[in-house]
From Swiss-Prot:
S-adenosyl-L-methionine binds at R115, D116, E131, R132, D181. It catalyses: guanosine(1516) in 16S rRNA + S-adenosyl-L-methionine = N(2)-methylguanosine(1516) in 16S rRNA + S-adenosyl-L-homocysteine + H(+). This is Ribosomal RNA small subunit methyltransferase J. The lineage of its organism: Bacteria, Pseudomonadati, Pseudomonadota, Gammaproteobacteria, Oceanospirillales. Keywords: Cytoplasm, Methyltransferase, rRNA processing, S-adenosyl-L-methionine, Transferase. Gene3D superfamilies: Vaccinia Virus protein VP39. Pfam families: SAM_MT. One of its GO terms (molecular function) is rRNA (guanine-N2-)-methyltransferase activity. Belongs to the methyltransferase superfamily. RsmJ family. PANTHER family: RIBOSOMAL RNA SMALL SUBUNIT METHYLTRANSFERASE J. InterPro entries: 16SrRNA_methylTrfase_J (IPR007536), SAM-dependent_MTases_sf (IPR029063).
Length: 263
């Protein structure tokens, strides 16, 4: 059970009361009808709102940005699916999609909102995702559910499997690559994902066990481990990677352990 001391409330539309009630009961969160919500204030309060169309995380502060939700059907991810850089994407290069390596089994141990997992699945990978925060898991699960209703997106998300919990407690067989994107304290004041980073900072926080995640990954029989890091951030465990794929705002530290193969 999680405890947010009324920092997170669960709200609902009439059509989704049962889902909202089950979630609030499972995780010990207060359930509030939309018409009974408290007045907005400067206090950090979030609603996990089960609306008629989606599950969304709403910042209930005065003058707050819009809601956070997962959308694989429209917007940036749909554009990347149709017009993206293909295997030229940094995440694709980092996991090793090149030449004869066309399909890999990837375990994303820190799924978040599923963006990188979706890019990899769109390129043919099978991605097993683990998310340990139940609020973030609920957002991602709902995004996957809605994507199954769109033929183009469904062909991608059918290669994505989501679990709630710790990836390394029950590590699945047949994984080629472990992908880690631990939360890191956000230093930039202006960002395209500012509202999401603020929400994650408030309800998730940084991952203090990021080093332990890499250590756990290194104990697995996998061929490669990829760690996504901000520019200037130290390497996890102080361990230098085999090589690094670097972009404008971040980098991918790649630990190449065995030769990759994939059909």
């Amino acid at each position: 059970m999680i405890s947010y001391d009324d920092q997170v409330l669960v709200s609902y539309s009439n059509q989704r009361w049962e889902e909202a009630e089950a979630f609030s009961s499972q995780f010990g969160l207060r359930l509030v009808a939309l018409e009974a919500l408290p007045a907005k204030s400067d206090r950090a309060v979030y609603l996990l709102n089960f609306s008629d169309t989606r599950v969304e995380l709403v910042n209930w502060r005065e003058q707050a940005p819009g809601p956070v939700f997962v959308d694989f059907v429209e917007g940036a991810l749909a554009y990347r699916r149709e017009h993206g850089g293909g295997r030229g994407e940094m995440v694709a290069k980092s996991v090793g999609l090149k030449g004869e390596v066309k399909c890999l089994n990837v375990l994303d141990a820190t799924a978040g909102l599923g963006r990188d997992a979706y890019v990899l699945a769109a390129l043919g990978c099978h991605v097993v995702m683990y998310e340990r925060n139940p609020l973030v898991h609920a957002l991602l699960a709902d995004g996957l559910r809605r994507a199954l209703e769109c033929a183009d997106a469904a062909s991608v998300v059918s290669r994505m499997t989501l679990h709630l919990g710790e990836a390394f407690n029950t590590f699945p067989d047949g994984i080629d690559v472990v992908y880690l994107d631990p939360m890191f304290p956000e230093r930039r004041k202006s960002s395209a994902v500012k509202k999401e980073m603020q929400a994650f900072k408030d309800i998730v926080g940084a991952d203090p066990d990021a080093d332990e995640l890499l250590a756990a990954a290194l104990r697995q029989e996998v061929k490669r481990i990829v760690v996504k890091r901000p520019k200037g951030a130290p390497c996890l465990l102080g361990r230098e990677p085999s090589f690094t794929v670097t972009g404008k705002s971040g980098r991918f530290d790649v630990y190449a352990l065995r030769k990759l193969t994939g059909g």
